[in-house]
Amino acid sequence: MPTATPYEDLLRLVLDTGTPKSDRTGTGTRSLFGHQMRYDLNAGFPLITTKKVHTKSIVYELLWFLRGDSNVRWLQERGVTIWDEWASPTGDLGPVYGVQWRSWPTPSGEHIDQISAALDLLKRDPDSRRNIVSAWNVGEIPQMALPPCHAFFQFYVADGRLSCQLYQRSADLFLGVPFNIASYALLTHMMAAQAGLGVGEFIWTGGDCHIYDNHVEQVTEQLSRDPRPYPELVLAPRDSIFDYTYEDVVIKNYEPHPAIKAPVAI
């Protein structure tokens, strides 16, 4: 069975039909507004194969989010530097993803652990249409080093299988989106395991889907490569969603094409 290539198809679509736009970084982009990709999580783990993706950074970043952390020191100690450009001299990023996921502040001074609440709801009421986690806290965006790009996700259960849909307001297609697809696919597997469910789909919905002008050459090279079969995820059993370690996440048979370097737009 041929490997599904929704990500590569989106790259090609934006390259061919994207609208030239200016952007906050001053780099310039080709952009398309509104697109959806679907990945069957039973057909392999959706880690892009047309270039090598740094899986260590993906796994540690997700564990960092689940810790409720917003300081890059924990990542740096594990050799992950993907957030360094936005951090303060002390490593702080403000109330970014992990803080909102685990400790959303309420007007009464309490804090909501959205991940725990989502998992509890999966167990109590799997048919709920309210199982949503949001990082887009309007009142705290000015304090964030970078407003959330992957802002909002929803869980859905059908036939004993858990699916997740992410809304990503701003999608750096070459550098960022391969990370985001794999990260939320991994989170879906973790949540499903904790709720006693199988996995269904990961659905990615993008707002401003863009290729930076200084990534066009790299994207063209990537699209010249034939996609390979997706790898397999093996997740060790854990008692809590917050107990997972890097060693618990094993990605087998990942045989991608070589990595392609590109500058980050800050």
UniProtKB/Swiss-Prot annotation:
Catalytic activity entry: dUMP + (6R)-5,10-methylene-5,6,7,8-tetrahydrofolate = 7,8-dihydrofolate + dTMP
Gene Ontology terms for molecular function: thymidylate synthase activity
Pathway linked to the protein: Pyrimidine metabolism; dTTP biosynthesis
InterPro entries, per the entry: Thymidate_synth/dCMP_Mease, Thymidate_synth/dCMP_Mease_dom, Thymidate_synth/dCMP_Mease_sf, Thymidylate_synthase, Thymidylate_synthase_AS
Enzyme class: transferase
Cited PROSITE patterns: THYMIDYLATE_SYNTHASE (PS00091)
Main location: cytoplasm
GO CC annotations, alphabetized: cytosol
Pfam families: Thymidylat_synt
The organism's place on the tree of life at top rank: Bacteria
Catalytic residues identified in the record: 149 (nucleophile)
Binding positions for (6R)-5,10-methylene-5,6,7,8-tetrahydrofolate per the UniProt entry: 54, 172, 265
Quaternary structure and interacting proteins, as annotated: Homodimer.
PANTHER family: THYMIDYLATE SYNTHASE, THYMIDYLATE SYNTHASE 1
Entry protein name: Thymidylate synthase
Gene from which the chain derives: thyA
